[in-house]
Structures are given as structure tokens and as C-alpha cells.
Amino acid sequence: MADEKTFRIGFIVLGLFLLSLGTFLMSHDRPQVYGTFYAMGSIMVIGGVLWSMCQCYPKITFVPADSDFQGMLSPKALSLLETGLSEVKSPQPPYVRLWEEAAYDQSLPDFTHIQMKVMGYSEDPRPLLAPELKTGTSSAKEGEPHSAQTWMEAAVVVHRELDEKEGEKSRSQSSPPACSQGSAPLASFHDDLDVGSSEGRSPQPSPPDRDEAHLQVPWASRGPLDRFGDFALIDDTPISEDMGLEGQAQEEALPSKQPWSLRMKEETVQAGAEEPEQEEEDLYYGLPDSPGDPLPDKELGFEPDVQG
């Protein structure tokens, strides 16, 4: 590399010398000589400059990747590496690998025995839930050991919502469950209830005997419960049975209410006698003149105005 660099520099310097020599000869009126020196000098200078410019760029060489790696390893290591790579590439013949893949595919579980059975609402799924063990022997050729497979059968019960017709039939067939007396039914209003008109009306509290009569009637005697059995409509009209029970309860409660009504009449008479006295006291304006008056008229010092 150093020799090439010095040669390029000498080539350029020689071209410059030929140019200067041609200029000197041109001053002595010899055109046939200095033209030759000018042409040779210019060619040498241009060639040297282009050569130097091409050497500045890096050279592109294709070097294999294994060459550097092979230079670092010894020949024994290279031979061992080649044998190991050959073993890894083909550990078994191709037909052996295909046979192993086929055996693995056969060892996978088979899901073809799964069956689906749609059961009705009234059917009992308990017999299907009992697990059963079954053994199956795979067909094998002569001289090969028989492989036995065991699997367990289990049933999966999926509960789906019944249609309205099926639900009504099942409710009519099955007896309605008795509701607990501790939990009270929820109350709900009608959608078309007029709130403004209900506020203007005077509140009419329901008698306590009506609630007692409702509690005495068992829930089972009211017929099969509907889908919204836990809700009680406030504006619902009473049933004929409830009306009969309410009438009986009111007839039984009449003799017990008679002494209470007499007592209320006596209290109203006493209150009416006290009301006139309170009205007379309210009409009086000023301090009352009574023997217990702390400020009598004599001590007040009032004197009548005498008009003279």
C-alpha cells in the first residue's frame, strides 16, 4: 500500500515537471517541442489524480463467513463439528419419524363417542350422572402387545329456560310451594296511577282487621302462584273470598267497638263544655280584675280626666 501511494505521488509530480518544461520551451520559440511536453504532462497529472481518488474509497471484497471461524479452530475441532452437525440434521431415518408421528396421532384421545341427549324438564338426570368405566382394546397385529384404553363416561346437564307454555304446564302439574309467613310480599303500583288525583283525596287508612284476615288465609288456598307471586298490587280489587272473610271479621269486631264509641262520646261532651270558657277568656282584652291580681287599679295611679 505504501509503494502504491509513493508511485501515485511521483506520477503526479512528473506530470507537473513536464508541464513546466513545456512552458519554458514555449518561451524560446520552439512550438514543435513544447506541445509534446504539455500533452504528456497533462495526461500524467490527470491520471495520478484520478488514481488517488479511486484509492480513497474502501474495497469491496466477498469473504465467506466460515473462513474466519475456520481460522480460529483447529482441524480436529472442525472435524468434530462436521460430524456433530451431520448427526443433528438426521438423527433418525425419515420412515422411522413418520411411524412415530402416526403412533402419536393414534395415542390422542378420541372424542367421537360423545353423544348429546335432550331431556325434558320432568325427566331425572341422576341416572346419567353416575360414572361408568369402559375399556376398549385397540386392534393389533400378531406379535404386537395389546394396548388397553380406559375412559370414563360422564353426563353434562345443561339447564335451559322453559318456554311460557311449558312453564304453565309444569306449574299446573306441580303443587305450588308454600310461602313463609315471615317474609312479606313486595308492593308495586300500577303504571296508569294518577298521582295528582290521589294526593287530593283524603287518606283512608285500611282497618287492621283486613290485614289480619289476609294473614289467616293460607297461601296454598289461593291457587297456583303466577310468575310474579312475590309482588302484591296495591290497587288490586279484593277477591270474593277475601270480601266474605272481611265481612265476618267486621261483624265480630262490632261488639268490641261499642264501648270504645261510648267513651269517645263522653270525651267530646266534656270538650264541648270547656270550649265556651276558653272563648270568653280569649275575648277579654287587658289585665283581668281578680282578687289575686298583683296590680290592682288603686296602685296603678290612674286619675280620671276632669274637664273644667
From Swiss-Prot:
Cytoplasmic topological domain residue ranges: 1-5, 54-308
Keyword annotations: Cell membrane, Lipoprotein, Membrane, Palmitate, Phosphoprotein, Transmembrane, Transmembrane helix
Organism superkingdom: Eukaryota
Membrane-spanning intervals of the chain: 6-26, 33-53
Bias-annotated ranges (Acidic residues): 274-283
Signal peptide as annotated in the record: none
Positions where lipid (S-palmitoyl cysteine) attaches: 54, 56
Induction per the UniProt record: Regulated in parallel with CLCNKA under furosemide treatment. A significant decrease occurred after furosemide treatment in inner medulla (0.5 fold), whereas cortical and outer medulla levels remained unaffected. Regulation with CLCNKA in inner medulla is limited to the thin limb; levels in collecting ducts were not affected by furosemide treatment. During furosemide treatment selective down-regulation with CLCNKA in thin limb plays a role in maintaining salt and water homeostasis.
GO CC list: basolateral plasma membrane; plasma membrane; protein-containing complex
Compositionally biased residues, Basic and acidic residues: 162-171
Compositionally biased tracts (Polar residues): 172-183
Localization of this protein: Basolateral cell membrane
Phosphoserine carried by residues: 79, 107, 290
Membrane topology: Multi-pass membrane protein
UniProt keyword Transmembrane helix, yes or no: yes
Subunit structure: Interacts with CLCNK channels. Forms heteromers with CLCNKA in the thin ascending limb of Henle and with CLCNKB in the thick ascending limb and more distal segments.
Protein name, entry field: Barttin
